[in-house]
Amino acid sequence: MTDDAGVTDAAAHYAPEIDGEPDPGEVVWAWVPYEDDPSQGKDRPVLVLAPDERSAGDGWVGLMLTSQDHDRDAEDEARHGRHWMDVGTGGWDSQGRPSEVRLDRLVRLERAGVRREGAVLDERVFHEVLAARRGLDG
């Protein structure tokens, strides 16, 4: 499910801990459904923002990452309600490619859908992502 219910600014706090469990500030690999056909999707890196307040402690919410560059088509993406932010490189991409995070589509992660931890996002960048998400609302 991909909606904004279930996460608040208070719940989103930087707390990575490489322990096999997703934590805010970590990038994990998880199954993400396609928007146009939620019955299909693919494994992709997801930045964990917070525990999912709806899941009774057994899920998380996050934002998907991509190595595709949306800077060149940012106006078109924004017209379609898609907003991206550069987050740099990290251990989540084995080829070391720069990544972008999609700010406007919150992804719900269930424990069974998380495949593995990928890396930890820099704390400064994590807080910049949160600020950019808040900026979409106003």
Segments (PLM) and residue ranges:
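Conserved functional hotspots at enzyme active or ligand-binding sites that engage polyanionic ligands
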Residues: 1-45, 49-138
